């Protein structure tokens, strides 16, 4: 499945570059500064996670998708080749520059792909943000999406903020809708690997209900107890799919991706 999605993504890039040569879209990819904002391996990670959305969440071409923390379109670009004209994509992010690029280069060619700036405070990424995460209401109606996904978002958020976002995710999901999100989950195995020095992150500093790699900049990377995450999903009617898809960050084998992936379905209300 992932190989199919990667080939599809490469075809999209080829068409974009051809359009640029013909006087169409000026860029196939965001500038390097915007790609680095969302992390490395821009194309590869985008293709990887669209594969997970299709394979693990059962995303259909005619469904409505919400990308929380969409950045500069790393997932949106490959999704333009998967969602059809009946499908719909919405994404929001704290980066005005990233959203402006997406609106100019993606929405202009795909009107069913919409992007919004969310001026949410983050001590690292948006220190002048207007809203606190706990006060932010997703700008979408109840039960308006089939799939909601977040990649490398909850890995930078404190437990109360994660809980609020999961409440909002449950609100905007249709009954039977699915959610994919990534974490650094702290459980017996990952904590043992951390203690043995096998983990990519040591999470040596403890905060209220979380661990972090940096005492002064805790949002740089946050690990959450798996028990907490499971409890919050249950609180908001999100049934977790078993087994969880643990990542390689802790030194665990086997693994699926780098971060831990949790898939859940909203139960009928």
From Swiss-Prot:
Q: Classify the source by domain of life.
A: Bacteria
Q: Does the keyword Protein transport apply?
A: no
Q: What is its EC number?
A: 2.1.1.-
Report whether Methyltransferase shows up as a keyword of the record: yes
Gene Ontology annotations of biological process type: methylation
Instruction: Name the top EC class.
Output: transferase
What does the UniProt keyword field contain? Methyltransferase, Transferase
Any one Gene Ontology MF annotation carried by this entry is: methyltransferase activity
Concerning its family, UniProt says:
Belongs to the methyltransferase superfamily.
Q: What is this protein called?
A: Uncharacterised methyltransferase MT1546
Q: Which organism is it from?
A: Mycobacterium tuberculosis (strain CDC 1551 / Oshkosh)
Q: What broad taxonomic lineage does this protein's source fall under? A: Bacteria, Bacillati, Actinomycetota, Actinomycetes, Mycobacteriales
């Amino acid at each position: 499945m992932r190989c199919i999605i990667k080939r599809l993504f490469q075809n999209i890039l080829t068409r974009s570059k051809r359009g640029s040569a013909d006087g169409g879209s000026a860029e196939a990819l965001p500038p390097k500064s915007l790609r680095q904002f969302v992390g490395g391996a821009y194309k590869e990670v985008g293709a990887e996670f669209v594969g997970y959305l299709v394979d693990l969440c059962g995303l259909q071409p005619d469904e409505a998708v919400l990308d929380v923390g969409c950045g500069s379109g790393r997932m949106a670009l490959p999704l333009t080749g998967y969602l059809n004209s009946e499908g719909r994509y919405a994404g929001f992010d704290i980066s005005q520059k990233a959203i402006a690029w997406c609106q100019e280069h993606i929405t202009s060619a795909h009107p069913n792909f919409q992007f919004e700036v969310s001026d949410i405070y983050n001590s690292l990424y948006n220190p002048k943000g207007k809203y606190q995460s706990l006060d932010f209401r997703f700008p979408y109606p109840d039960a308006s999406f089939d799939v909601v996904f977040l990649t490398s978002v909850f890995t930078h958020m404190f437990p109360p903020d994660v809980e609020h976002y999961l409440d909002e995710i449950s609100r905007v999901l249709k009954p039977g809708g699915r959610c994919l999100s990534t974490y650094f989950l702290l459980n017996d195995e990952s904590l043992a690997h951390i203690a043995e020095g096998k983990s990519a992150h040591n999470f040596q500093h403890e905060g209220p209900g979380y661990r972090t790699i940096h005492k002064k900049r805790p949002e740089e990377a946050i690990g959450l107890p798996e028990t907490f995450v499971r409890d919050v999903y249950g609180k908001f009617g999100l049934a977790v799919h078993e087994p969880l898809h643990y990542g390689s960050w802790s030194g665990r084998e086997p693994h699926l991706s780098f971060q831990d992936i949790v898939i859940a379905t909203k139960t009928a209300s």
